[in-house]
Amino acid sequence: MSSGKVVQVIGPVVDVQFPLSESLPDIDDALKVKREDGTELVIEVALELGDGIMRTVAMDSTDGLKRGAEVEGTGASISVPVGKDTLGRVFNVLGNTIDNGPEFDEDHPRNPIHRDAPKYDQLSTGIEILETGIKVIDLLAPYIKGGKIGLFGGAGVGKTVLIQELIHNIAQEHNGISVFTGVGERTREGNDLYFEMKESGVLEKTAMVFGQMNEPPGARMRVALTGLTLAEYFRDVEGQDVLLFIDNIFRFTQAGSEVSALLGRIPSAVGYQPTLATEMGQLQERITSTKKGSVTSIQAVYVPADDYTDPAPATTFAHLDATTNLERSLTQQGIYPAVDPLASTSSALTPEIVGEEHYEVATEVQHVLQRYRELQDIISILGMDELSDEEKIIVARARRIQFFLSQNFHVAEQFTGNPGSYVPVEETVKGFKEILEGKYDNLPEEAFRLVGGIEDVVEKAKKLAGNN
């Protein structure tokens, strides 16, 4: 293995000089360097500067590094443990366990985090819907097995809670395996998620990988690849359908932009790295269905200042099959999950994939909600009395639909005190069809808020009538 010396440290970026007589390490190779206190730091080769100098990115803090420190090549890229033993465990970017449990042996199967996307002849072309049990998603923006789904929303609108609910529903109802990757988010949230999942029994079906806010950009930039490598093993070797959760894909881009300038690259639009589209493509192209199994990815996308034209969310958009847009105005009305029924989209919402009835009900729901949105200006200026009888019916049904799109979550039970609900797709379609037909026009609007199926609405209406 080639060995060199540290010649410069600029924050998370370390320059290493190798003797010209030796072969240089490859791009993306992992190198090891000892700090003054004897601890080991892993750095990854990013660029060759010439004269035997390689510019690298550190996977941990560079505190305690000094010029002249010995650097050893490993001859390979970072590799992480894979297999069934990873379920129920928590890892960092390097594949080291961080849950106080036993470490994995050196001879445990490991895969490199840098890999090529599956070849075209390995890809599966069939389309299958993934039922989530969340009404607004299953009805208006259904998820595809092996697809890529974006959860868009600003700060504090409920992206992480929605992800937790999806993990819960997939584990409990579908017995599915999930890999949760925390990229640059709050450590407290990761900690809470771990203990909540342990309590609810979901953890045995989930592997967790974290590179949180307090970690250097190198770790945040590579941790998504670590999570993806774990998921790929279950797809390619075990032949399973895996859910890969990434919270938050924006932080992956943000970490790349933090190191980009230090690596000497000229920034592009809004200060992002010029390699933004390439980095995103290398990650996203590996997330797909093959003939052996599938990786379905659900990615929370933080939208800076709620600006969807920002290059980071805009680049992510290009790769997605479905989008779930969370809207702050809905949280203010107490509608949870705060999914915007008109802005959320899915390429699977076609009669050929979801069926004729589902498609017709979904488009009619969107039509009624769109008409209600148009009428709101008239209502706010002139009041309800100025509407025609037909428009009054549309408004009444739209409000019932809007409330019926909300539901209680299992993972929020401890905060709300209300039990969560899982609603099968057939029941969801049936409920909305009956509301559109006017079957429940006589029930109070409040009966539709935060309930499961349509039977729950009737029950709640009886309770409300009893209380009055």
UniProtKB/Swiss-Prot annotation:
It is a peripheral membrane protein. GO terms for molecular function: ATP binding; ATP hydrolysis activity; proton-transporting ATP synthase activity, rotational mechanism. It catalyses: ATP + H2O + 4 H(+)(in) = ADP + phosphate + 5 H(+)(out). Its EC number is 7.1.2.2. InterPro entries: AAA+_ATPase, ATP-synt_VA_C, ATP_synth_F1_bsu, ATPase_a/bsu_AS, ATPase_alpha/beta_chains, ATPase_F1/V1/A1_a/bsu_N, ATPase_F1/V1/A1_a/bsu_N_sf, ATPase_F1/V1/A1_a/bsu_nucl-bd. It is an enzyme of class 7 (translocase). It is found in: Cell membrane. Keywords: ATP synthesis, ATP-binding, Cell membrane, CF(1), Hydrogen ion transport, Ion transport, Membrane, Nucleotide-binding, Translocase, Transport. ATP binds at G153, G154, A155, G156, V157, G158, K159, T160. One of its GO terms (cellular component) is proton-transporting ATP synthase complex. It comes from the Bacteria. Belongs to the ATPase alpha/beta chains family. F-type ATPases have 2 components, CF(1) - the catalytic core - and CF(0) - the membrane proton channel. CF(1) has five subunits: alpha(3), beta(3), gamma(1), delta(1), epsilon(1). CF(0) has three main subunits: a(1), b(2) and c(9-12). The alpha and beta chains form an alternating ring which encloses part of the gamma chain. CF(1) is attached to CF(0) by a central stalk formed by the gamma and epsilon chains, while a peripheral stalk is formed by the delta and b chains. PANTHER family: ATP SYNTHASE, ATP SYNTHASE SUBUNIT BETA, MITOCHONDRIAL. Produces ATP from ADP in the presence of a proton gradient across the membrane. The catalytic sites are hosted primarily by the beta subunits. This is ATP synthase subunit beta. It comes from Ligilactobacillus salivarius (strain UCC118) (Lactobacillus salivarius). The gene is atpD.
